[in-house]
Amino acid sequence: MPFWYRPVTWAWLLLPLALLFKMISFCRRLAYQKGFFKRYKSKLPVIIVGNISVGGNGKTPFVIWLCEMLITVGYKPAVISRGYGGKSNHYPLLVGDHIKGHEAGDEPVLIHKRLGIPVVVDPNRKNAVKYIEQHFLADIIISDDGLQHYALQRDIEIVIVDGKRRFGNQHLMPIGPLRENLSRLNSVDFVVNNGGQQVNEITMLLKAQNCQRVDGETAQLSSGVQVNACAAIGYPQRFFDTLNQQQFEILKAVGFNDHHAFSKDDFTQFEASIPLLMTEKDAVKCTDFAQPNWWYLPVSAEFSAGFEQQLLNRIKEIKC
């Protein structure tokens, strides 16, 4: 919500709802911690990559980097996801080349496309973990989001923070964007700052790669040309800022709701002769009707020195 990131007096009308949300969240987490609710403990190490605020903070690029790094050093990771924005007629859903974004959600489809590793979607993450344990030789599980899914025990918690917007007005939903109190950051293993620098936080930078055609054809798009742009992510302006940094001249920029299910009609507002740029996450939802002049901008995550080894050391502690 825009008012989460700028002062508005009427937001305090939502205070009773925020207090109710706080009470429910606290009691729910406490119930799992004290054993009143059952938690599933996997035989494999589980790493949660999540956030304490609503909206896109950069979890998916981090998950992709993490899995690539683990593969490089010899691990066999698998990814689980709730599949937000998708709806399947059965779960657990194993993401494959034939699975579309409207079934699995855009992030799981993107992760599978980039990595080719097992990606399993289930609103109940415990069932996704069990599916991986039964059907794959994975030796570590990465949960894309799920910090607040306390029914699943975890070994490492990593929180991604938006380095520009941070935590908005620092209030709990619905007054603010927080899913949990800021004090929750004190109990996680790593806090990763996407695009900013803060003491005791790991700096993550998203580096833009060469633009790719959405339809999969091989071609090149030079930076500096005039383009239109669209983004259906938590913070579209971040993507538009990235395009500006790549020297693209944006003629028209349109932000859609996060996880928007694209159709052909969404693109009639753009001049067909002008290249259209979108995020890689959005591109996986548009392949069936992509035009030759549609492009996406892949990004890769880079980190401050020493973080990779810190994380590997923490994983080794679990496996000992």
Curated annotation (Swiss-Prot):
The top EC class, named as a word, is transferase
What pathway does this protein act in? Glycolipid biosynthesis; lipid IV(A) biosynthesis; lipid IV(A) from (3R)-3-hydroxytetradecanoyl-[acyl-carrier-protein] and UDP-N-acetyl-alpha-D-glucosamine: step 6/6
The answer to whether the entry has keyword Kinase is yes
Matches recorded under SUPFAM superfamilies: P-loop containing nucleoside triphosphate hydrolases
Its GO biological process annotations read:
lipid A biosynthetic process; lipopolysaccharide core region biosynthetic process
Q: Could you list this entry's UniProt keywords, alphabetically sorted.
A: ATP-binding, Kinase, Lipid A biosynthesis, Lipid biosynthesis, Lipid metabolism, Nucleotide-binding, Transferase
| The enzyme's E.C. designation | 2.7.1.130
Task: Give me the reactions it catalyses.
Answer: a lipid A disaccharide + ATP = a lipid IVA + ADP + H(+)
Report the domain of life of the source organism.
Answer: Bacteria
Q: Which InterPro entries match?
A: LpxK, P-loop_NTPase
**Which Pfam family, just one, is annotated for this protein?**
LpxK
| Gene Ontology terms for molecular function | ATP binding; tetraacyldisaccharide 4'-kinase activity
Listed binding positions for ATP are: 53-60
Entry's PANTHER family? TETRAACYLDISACCHARIDE 4'-KINASE, TETRAACYLDISACCHARIDE 4'-KINASE, MITOCHONDRIAL-RELATED
Recorded family membership? Belongs to the LpxK family.
Purpose of the protein = Transfers the gamma-phosphate of ATP to the 4'-position of a tetraacyldisaccharide 1-phosphate intermediate (termed DS-1-P) to form tetraacyldisaccharide 1,4'-bis-phosphate (lipid IVA).
Name of protein: Tetraacyldisaccharide 4'-kinase
Q: Which organism is it from?
A: Psychromonas ingrahamii (strain DSM 17664 / CCUG 51855 / 37)
Q: Which gene encodes it?
A: lpxK
